[in-house]
Regions:
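Small-molecule kinase domains that catalyze NTP-dependent phosphoryl transfer to phosphate-bearing small molecules
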Residues: 95, 99-148, 160-162
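Glycine-rich phosphate-binding loop used to anchor ATP phosphates in small-molecule kinases
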Residues: 33-85
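Conserved nucleotide-binding/hydrolysis micro-motifs of P-loop NTPases
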Residues: 15-16, 59-60, 87-92
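Short, hydrophobic alpha-helical segments
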Residues: 153-158
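Short, well-ordered secondary-structure micro-motifs
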Residues: 21-22, 64-65, 94-97
Length: 162
């Protein structure tokens, strides 16, 4: 089996799907529920020492307050936040996007949606207020990306130790 970090993965779309099952997307109650779910998971994972990967598409600068709040929440209970920006060639991104696995788990899988979001927001910039690792994963397997992240941030992982 490919090496893994052993970290739990909390995909952004999971909180969205949960809230959307009850509230219309974009409404105030929807936003409040998404927010409560995310921050409850962040805080409890950090408090309990559960290593967590949270995935989302960062829109600069609109999402900076969210990132700062995540960091404050996690660090406030003794956790650590390691920001990672994954990038790849636009052609490769567009080729990967329609993969059935992405749609199956609720991730963005539409080229039209990507183009709309990229036209409306800056989704290719790093978070300006925090250190972050940028990894070009154009030619890398997920396990290789994980190893780079673990080594860069000196994260505990038996499978990646020197």
């Amino acid at each position: 089996p490919p090496p893994t970090t052993g970290f739990k993965v909390f995909h952004n779309h999971v909180s969205i799907a949960c809230a959307e099952s009850v509230f219309d997307f974009g409404t105030k109650p929807f936003g409040r529920v998404v927010d409560k779910i995310r921050f409850a998971v962040f805080e409890e994972a950090a408090r309990e020492g559960v290593s967590l990967v949270f995935t989302f598409v960062y829109a600069c600068p609109e999402d900076t307050p969210f990132v700062e709040r995540v960091c404050e929440t996690v660090e406030g209970v003794g956790g650590r936040v390691c920001l990672v920006r994954l990038v790849c060639d636009r052609e490769v991104l567009e080729r990967r996007l329609p993969h059935p696995e992405r749609a199956r788990v609720g991730k963005m899988a539409s080229l039209d949606m990507l183009r709309e979001v990229a036209g409306r927001y800056d989704i290719f910039s790093p978070v300006p207020t925090r250190e972050s690792l940028s990894v070009d994963n154009t030619a890398l397997a997920p396990a290789e990306v994980a190893e780079l992240i673990v080594r860069h941030y000196h994260l505990p992982s038996a499978e990646f130790k020197d």
